[in-house]
């Protein structure tokens, strides 16, 4: 109560922050008359002047007022659009590395031009991030007119570009790109072998459009570049056949936690089936040797019980394609990990693709924290303000609308069953269509959108096909409807463009990230491009365009008279933000509008998260068939349920981040070291240090500090030196010398190893030797890093069990991850040293550049592995072929230098009985 009173007197923190920007807005407005008198050339020259002032010591903050005023004047001249005062405030929030919450239709795309221009003056590159290729291309082409007028270059990063095109786009002053492309380019860059092959510049400033969608909804989804493992498609298909034979009592499903577990009876039944199929390696399903089978069974069970076709995924062209739960869009190229996607493919009887090994990965949380400065825009961020502040250190500022919102938001109507709810929805749609009020119906899945479409067809309405140009003409007849979901995404722009005409009925899955406003009366630009595509420029086209604009103006008045856009929600989403995004489609720029949600006790949110108290109250009221209950108390109860879900999801994201930060810190170290190695022309010093460290560690292992020669393991050291360094040295004779000590032995071995490598350098030439050293070092680092990622992934899956032993799983994970990282660096030194001591180059022509990385990495979107083994770069150079095989009779078991080339699956020549790859071959 006191807090509310204080806010009335002093205003909220948000109000005070907005007021703080007003003096700058007034200063920008004062400059407007002066800038209007400048010629186009004089206005353009201000960019050169600003850059000169930056070079002389001024800051970007010093230039904010004149730079913003310059952009506003340029937009007026080039596009006929003038930034409103509230848009100037939005631009300042973005420049201050905050999140500007702006309602739908308030011109976020135009707002971005202000901070983008200002920050691009620094010459370090500004990234504008969108959720899909269509929006990246549209916004870039649209706003490039302003940037180009002011002398800045604009680049676009979309799927399908080669590295040269990407490099050129990133070199521009302003680069528009999708979050996926940016993340994948970063990962690919850190798999390249030369600095010149990388495409991105250092991360300076980014503005993220639909920031809640990217940094909240997709935060837990890592970007992964992976390569296929062995094909096990038959095994997935076999396991899948067992799942339908289980009954409901054989497993328990927890929809809240999205988990499923077999009961005792289920385990016994599964063991019996696996034994009969001769797949079980021992009596019990949970014996250690059956761990892999248990994993496959669990994933198959998840695929059948937790994932629904046309809700979580669709089947298209012999593929299982994931559907984004927040946007309703298909995500081709994205695959569930850990065998779940293969289990879904087996369930749907499509071709089972090979499993993948992770080569590189990063979450959006960690990728966007690479930027020096970050800003974001969205229509709905206030509900997640705490998370933005906590994880990204970004403040959310609600920007006032240019005109007051006139939309009416009704309380929810709750019915007992889905059937009754859909009856009421169809009735309301027909009423709106009859009075020519456009309706947008939001659904949560493809399945629900098609169910409603079928109900409308039964009521006598027909579905529009926007592949027919006639669908664009004039007002809707009130007897047709359009469906916008992942199946019809090719028609998306057309459907949204016509969703605001009088009498239009549009059924859509979640509207997040659609990017296109629903304009009452229709979208003039879309109609002109479609209807006048074949009409050349000239008086006739100008007259036709004017006629279309007049028609749309008349249609807008008709839609306004009918009450504006009516947004009808068919159920509540888990997140209040997604519901607000749907509501926000109505009432843009001060237009009237209406919104209402229809619910039933059978909805997922009500069924899984709704309180028993709510359900009990509704039943006690004794609702009759077709009756609804409407009360603000129900809205509050549902909001509490949504807040619970949001809090749970936030905790999950926070927990994921804590674990991912461990990997992220290690990733930074590896990528920074890798970049330094790539930048170095000569890595000889690094290689020498590694060799000396390896020798020091070897000697310390067999000759303890301050020990006597009789305590030394001379034979062990002799074998280790032959094994790792391929050197046959008189270590036993050295040990017999009077007064000999460990450090002296170390120095002698180092001297011999250095002489051996110096002779190789003299034999093959320093330039070629430097190339070989760099190649082996980078390839070995990449190979070990991939193994390390896999080990951390396995560790993360089981570390939670430590909690049962009263130990903190996170601290245990940090400790063991550090030990694994240290061990990886030790192995790197040892393997690089061993490989370089062994390398023999058959012929020595002049070295050429390393082959391009594109021949060796996986395509981010297709999932096809193009990354060769760790020796790819060497094998691509025939002149670097290693020595040929040596006959077995000529190999000395105690001297690896006599073995020559040994097949990885051959018995090791040392006589251990192991395969070469598991013995000495681990260095090869």
Curated annotation (Swiss-Prot):
InterPro entries: Helicase_ATP-bd, P-loop_NTPase, SEC_C_motif, SecA, SecA_CS, SecA_DEAD, SecA_motor_DEAD, SecA_preprotein_X-link_dom. Keywords: ATP-binding, Cell inner membrane, Cell membrane, Cytoplasm, Membrane, Metal-binding, Nucleotide-binding, Protein transport, Translocase, Translocation, Transport, Zinc. Its main location: membrane. Its cofactor is Zn(2+). Zn(2+) binds at residues 908, 910, 919-920. It is found in: Cell inner membrane; Cytoplasm. It is a peripheral membrane protein. GO terms for cellular component: cell envelope Sec protein transport complex; cytosol; plasma membrane. GO terms for molecular function: ATP binding; metal ion binding; protein-exporting ATPase activity. One of its GO terms (biological process) is protein import. Its EC number is 7.4.2.8. It catalyses: ATP + H2O + cellular proteinSide 1 = ADP + phosphate + cellular proteinSide 2. ATP binds at residues 87, 105-109, 517. May bind 1 zinc ion per subunit. It is an enzyme of class 7 (translocase). Monomer and homodimer. Part of the essential Sec protein translocation apparatus which comprises SecA, SecYEG and auxiliary proteins SecDF-YajC and YidC. NCBIfam families: PRK12904.1, secA. Part of the Sec protein translocase complex. Interacts with the SecYEG preprotein conducting channel. Has a central role in coupling the hydrolysis of ATP to the transfer of proteins into and across the cell membrane, serving both as a receptor for the preprotein-SecB complex and as an ATP-driven molecular motor driving the stepwise translocation of polypeptide chains across the membrane. HAMAP family: SecA (MF_01382). Belongs to the SecA family. This is Protein translocase subunit SecA. It comes from Azorhizobium caulinodans (strain ATCC 43989 / DSM 5975 / JCM 20966 / LMG 6465 / NBRC 14845 / NCIMB 13405 / ORS 571). The gene is secA.
């Amino acid at each position: 109560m006191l807090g509310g009173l204080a806010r009335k007197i002093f205003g909220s923190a948000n109000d005070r922050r907005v007021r703080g920007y007003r003096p700058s807005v007034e200063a920008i407005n004062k400059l407007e008359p002066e800038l209007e008198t400048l010629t186009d050339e004089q206005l353009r020259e201000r960019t050169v002047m600003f850059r000169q002032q930056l070079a002389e010591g001024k800051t970007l903050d010093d230039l904010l007022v004149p730079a913003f005023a310059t952009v506003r004047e340029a937009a007026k001249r080039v596009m006929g659009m003038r930034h409103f005062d509230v848009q100037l405030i939005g631009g300042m929030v973005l420049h201050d590395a905050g999140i500007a919450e702006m309602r739908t239709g308030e011109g976020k795309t135009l707002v971005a031009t202000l901070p983008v221009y200002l920050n691009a003056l620094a010459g370090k590159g500004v990234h504008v991030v969108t959720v899909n290729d269509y929006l990246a291309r549209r916004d870039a082409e649209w706003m490039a007119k302003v940037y180009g007028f002011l002398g800045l270059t604009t680049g676009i990063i979309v799927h399908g570009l080669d590295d040269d095109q990407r490099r050129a786009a990133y070199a521009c002053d302003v680069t528009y790109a999708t979050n996926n492309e940016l993340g994948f380019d970063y990962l690919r860059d850190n798999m390249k072998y030369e600095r010149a092959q990388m495409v991105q510049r250092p991360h300076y400033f980014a503005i993220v459009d639909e920031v809640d969608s990217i940094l909240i909804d997709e935060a837990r989804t890592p970007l992964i570049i992976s390569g296929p493992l062995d094909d096990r498609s038959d095994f997935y298909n076999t396991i899948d056949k067992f799942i339908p034979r289980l009954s409901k009592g054989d497993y328990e499903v927890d929809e809240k936690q999205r988990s499923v577990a077999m009961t005792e009876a289920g385990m016994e039944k599964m063991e019996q089936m696996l034994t009969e199929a001769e797949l079980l390696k021992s009596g019990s399903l949970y014996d250690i040797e059956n761990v892999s089978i248990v994993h496959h069974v669990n994933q198959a069970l998840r695929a059948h019980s937790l994932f629904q076709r046309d809700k979580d995924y669709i089947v298209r062209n012999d593929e299982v394609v994931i559907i984004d739960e927040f946007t309703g869009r298909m995500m081709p190229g994205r695959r569930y990990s850990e065998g779940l996607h293969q289990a879904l493919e087996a369930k749907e009887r499509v071709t089972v693709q090979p499993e993948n090994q992770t080569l590189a990965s990063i979450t959006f949380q960690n990728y966007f924290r690479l930027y020096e400065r970050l800003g974001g825009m969205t229509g709905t961020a206030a509900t997640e303000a705490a998370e933005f502040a906590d994880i990204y250190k970004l403040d959310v500022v609600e920007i006032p609308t240019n005109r007051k919102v006139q939309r009416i938001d009704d309380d929810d109507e709750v019915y007992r069953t889905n059937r009754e709810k859909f009856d009421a929805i169809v009735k309301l749609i027909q009423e709106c269509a009859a009075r020519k009020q456009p309706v947008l119906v939001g659904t949560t899945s493809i399945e629900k959108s098609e169910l409603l479409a079928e109900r409308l067809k039964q009521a006598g309405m027909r579905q529009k096909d926007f592949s027919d140009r006639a669908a664009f003409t004039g007002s809707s007849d009130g007897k047709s409807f359009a469906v916008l979901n992942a199946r019809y995404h090719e028609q998306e722009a057309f459907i949204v463009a016509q969703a605001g005409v009088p009498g239009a009925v549009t059924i859509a899955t979640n509207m997040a990230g659609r990017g296109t406003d629903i304009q009452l009366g229709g979208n003039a630009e879309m109609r002109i491009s479609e209807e006048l595509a074949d009409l050349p420029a000239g008086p006739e086209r100008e007259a036709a365009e004017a006629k279309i604009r007049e028609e749309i103006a008349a249609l807008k008045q008709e839609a306004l008279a009918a009450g504006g856009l009516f947004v009808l929600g068919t159920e509540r989403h888990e997140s209040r933000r997604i519901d607000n995004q749907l509501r926000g489609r109505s009432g843009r720029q001060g237009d009237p509008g209406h919104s209402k949600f229809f619910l039933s006790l059978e909805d997922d949110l009500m069924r899984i998260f709704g309180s028993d108290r709510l359900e009990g109250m509704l039943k006690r009221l004794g609702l009759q068939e077709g009756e609804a209950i409407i009360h603000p108390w129900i809205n509050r109860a549902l909001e509490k349920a949504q807040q619970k879900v949001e809090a749970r999801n936030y905790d999950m994201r926070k927990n994921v981040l804590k674990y991912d930060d461990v990997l992220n810190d290690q990733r930074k170290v590896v990528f920074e070291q890798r970049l330094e190695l790539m930048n170095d022309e000569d890595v000889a010093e690094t290689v020498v240090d590694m060799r000396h460290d390896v020798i020091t560690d070897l000697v310390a292992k067999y000759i303890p500090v301050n020990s006597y020669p009789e305590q030394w393991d001379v034979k062990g050291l002799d074998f280790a030196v032959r094994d790792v360094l391929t050197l046959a040295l008189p270590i036993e004779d050295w040990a017999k010398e009077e007064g000999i000590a460990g450090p002296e032995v170390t120095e002698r071995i180092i001297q011999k190893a250095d002489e051996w490598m110096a002779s190789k350098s003299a034999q093959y030439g320093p330039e070629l030797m430097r190339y070989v050293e760099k190649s082996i070092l980078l390839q070995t680092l990449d190979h070990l890093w991939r193994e390390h990622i896999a080990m951390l992934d396995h560790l993360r899956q089981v570390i939670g069990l430590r909690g049962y032993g009263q130990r903190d799983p996170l601290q245990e994970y940090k400790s063991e991850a550090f030990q694994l990282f240290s061990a990886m660096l030790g192995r790197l030194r040892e393997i690089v040293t061993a490989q370089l001591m062994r390398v023999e180059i058959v012929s020595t022509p002049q070295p050429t550049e390393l082959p391009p990385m594109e021949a060796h990495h996986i395509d981010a979107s297709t999932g096809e592995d193009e990354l060769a083994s760790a020796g790819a770069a060497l094998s691509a150079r025939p002149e670097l072929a290693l020595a040929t095989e040596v006959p077995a009779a000529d190999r000395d078991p105690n001297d690896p230098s006599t073995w020559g080339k040994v097949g990885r699956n051959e018995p090791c020549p040392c006589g251990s009985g192991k395969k070469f790859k598991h013995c000495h071959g681990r260095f090869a």
